[in-house]
Amino acid sequence: MKSPKKSIHTFQVIIEQDEAGWYVAECPALKACYTQGKTYEEAIANIKDVIAMCLEELKANGQPVPEQPEIISVRRVEVTV
């Protein structure tokens, strides 16, 4: 019996470092798809695993993989209040 064909997906992720020094990774294209790691590399490995789990759940529920929105720019802006 053949195993199901796997497909490759590419997603943009956001990595931030919190106050405690942990790296927090989020995939904006997939709701509730986030994780953390003690190192940057661990956060990247963890977000790949979480994205795979999210995609498997979508597939199991017969839902399509969401379109990856094109991010035009990520910037820091200064605001005075």
Question: What label would you give each PLM region?
Answer:
Residues Y23-E57:
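Amphipathic, hydrophobic secondary-structure cores in small proteins
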Residues M1-Q12, A45-V81:
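Short, charged, surface-exposed hinge/linker loops at domain edges
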